[in-house]
C-alpha cells in the first residue's frame, strides 16, 4: 500500500513524523546523508496482493469444504488465512483506487475518498493485528497439543476456539479504530510495538520449548533402539533449522514495520531515522510477503488440506 498520491493516507501517517512530516526529506538533504530508498512500484504491490489473495482464498475454501478440518487447530489456521486475505485485499483495493484517481478514471468527492480511506485503514490495521494474534494462537495450540496431549481435546474445544476467535476479531477492530484515531500519540505506537514484541517472545519461547521436548523424545527413542548419537544430532539440527526459518521469517517480515513505529517515537527528526522512514512502502510489502508465506508454513503442509484443495481445484475446472 504505497503512500504516493495526495489522496492516499492509509497508514500514511506512519510514513512521516507526527509533528513535522514535510521536513523529513529536508533534514536528510541538509546533512548530506545518503538514504537507501527502495522503490516499490504499484504493480508489484498489486502482484504480491493478488498472489496472497489467491493462496489464502484457497486455504479458507479448503477448510470450509472439508468437515474433517473443522477442528480448533484448523479454525485458527483458517482465521489466519482470512486475516492475511484482508491485509492483501485492502492493500490491493487502496492501490487500485489511487491508480484510478490519479489516472482520472474515477471521480469522487474528497469526503467520499476520506470515508473510503478510513474504512480501508480500519480493515488493514485490524487484519494486521488479528494476523499476529492468530500466529500466537497457533503456537499456543501446538504447545498444548504436545505438552498436554492427553487433555488436549478437553482443553482446546471447538466452542472455546470460536470464543477465542471472536475475542481476537473484536479486540483487533476496536484497537485498530483507536490506533487510527490516535495515531499521533506516542503511547499508541509504543503499545503496538510492545504487542509485536510480546507475540515474538511468546512464539519463540513456545517453539523453543517444543523443540527441546522433541529432541528429548528423539533421544529417548534412539536409546531404545541403540542408535548412534549422530542420528539424534541430525534431528536436532533439522528442528533448529525449521525453528530458525519459522521465527526468522516472522521477524524479517514484521520487524521492519514495527522498527519504523519505534523510530517515529524515538527519533522523528533525526536524519538517519528519516532515511528509514523513506522505506515505509518496503516494510508494508514485507508484511504482504508474510501473508504469502503463511499458507506455505501453516496450511499447505497438511496432507488432508492439500487433498481437499486438489478436489476443489478439480471441481472448479
From Swiss-Prot:
Membrane topology of this protein: Multi-pass membrane protein
Regions crossing the membrane: 38-63, 73-93, 119-140, 164-183, 192-211, 241-266, 280-300
InterPro entries given in the database record: GPCR_Rhodpsn, GPCR_Rhodpsn_7TM, Melcrt_ACTH_rcpt, MSH_rcpt
Residues on Cytoplasmic side: 64-72, 141-163, 212-240, 301-317
Keyword Cell membrane attached: yes
Extracellular side: 1-37, 94-118, 184-191, 267-279
Record's keyword terms, sorted: Cell membrane, G-protein coupled receptor, Glycoprotein, Lipoprotein, Membrane, Palmitate, Receptor, Transducer, Transmembrane, Transmembrane helix
Main location: membrane
Subunit description: Interacts with MGRN1, but does not undergo MGRN1-mediated ubiquitination; this interaction competes with GNAS-binding and thus inhibits agonist-induced cAMP production. Interacts with OPN3; the interaction results in a decrease in MC1R-mediated cAMP signaling and ultimately a decrease in melanin production in melanocytes.
Protein's recorded name: Melanocyte-stimulating hormone receptor
Lineage: Eukaryota, Metazoa, Chordata, Craniata, Vertebrata
Amino acid at each position: 500500500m504505497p503512500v504516493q498520491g495526495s489522496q492516499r493516507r492509509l497508514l500514511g501517517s506512519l510514513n512521516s513524523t507526527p509533528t513535522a512530516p514535510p521536513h523529513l526529506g529536508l533534514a536528510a538533504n541538509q546533512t548530506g546523508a545518503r538514504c537507501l530508498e527502495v522503490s516499490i512500484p504499484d504493480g508489484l504491490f498489486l502482484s504480491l496482493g493478488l498472489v496472497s489473495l489467491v493462496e489464502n482464498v484457497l486455504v479458507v475454501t479448503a477448510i470450509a469444504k472439508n468437515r474433517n478440518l473443522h477442528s480448533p487447530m484448523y479454525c485458527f489456521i483458517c482465521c489466519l488465512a482470512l486475516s492475511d486475505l484482508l491485509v492483501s485485499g485492502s492493500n490491493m483495493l487502496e492501490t487500485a483506487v489511487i491508480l484510478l484517481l490519479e489516472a482520472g478514471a474515477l471521480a469522487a468527492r474528497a469526503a467520499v475518498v476520506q470515508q473510503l480511506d478510513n474504512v480501508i485503514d480500519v480493515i488493514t490495521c485490524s487484519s494486521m493485528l488479528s494476523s499476529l494474534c492468530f500466529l500466537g494462537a497457533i503456537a499456543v495450540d501446538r504447545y498444548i497439543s504436545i505438552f498436554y496431549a492427553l487433555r488436549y481435546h478437553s482443553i482446546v474445544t471447538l466452542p472455546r476456539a470460536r470464543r477465542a476467535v471472536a475475542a481476537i476479531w473484536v479486540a483487533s477492530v476496536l484497537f485498530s479504530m483507536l490506533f487510527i484515531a490516535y495515531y499521533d500519540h506516542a503511547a499508541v505506537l509504543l503499545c503496538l510495538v510492545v504487542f509485536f514484541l510480546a507475540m515474538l517472545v511468546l512464539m519463540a519461547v513456545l517453539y523453543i520449548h517444543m523443540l527441546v521436548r522433541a529432541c528429548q523424545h528423539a533421544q529417548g527413542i534412539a536409546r531404545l533402539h541403540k542408535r548412534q548419537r549422530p542420528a539424534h544430532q541430525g534431528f536436532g539440527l533439522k528442528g533448529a533449522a525449521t525453528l530458525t526459518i519459522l521465527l526468522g521469517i516472522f521477524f524479517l517480515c514484521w520487524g521492519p514495520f514495527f522498527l519504523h513505529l519505534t523510530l517515529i517515537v524515538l527519533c522523528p527528526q533525526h536524519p538517519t531515522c528519516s532515511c528509514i522512514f523513506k522505506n515505509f512502502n518496503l516494510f508494508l510489502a514485507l508484511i504482504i510477503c508474510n501473508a504469502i508465506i503463511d499458507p506455505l508454513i501453516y496450511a499447505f503442509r497438511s496432507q488432508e488440506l492439500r487433498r481437499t484443495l486438489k478436489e476443489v481445484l478439480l471441481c472448479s475446472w
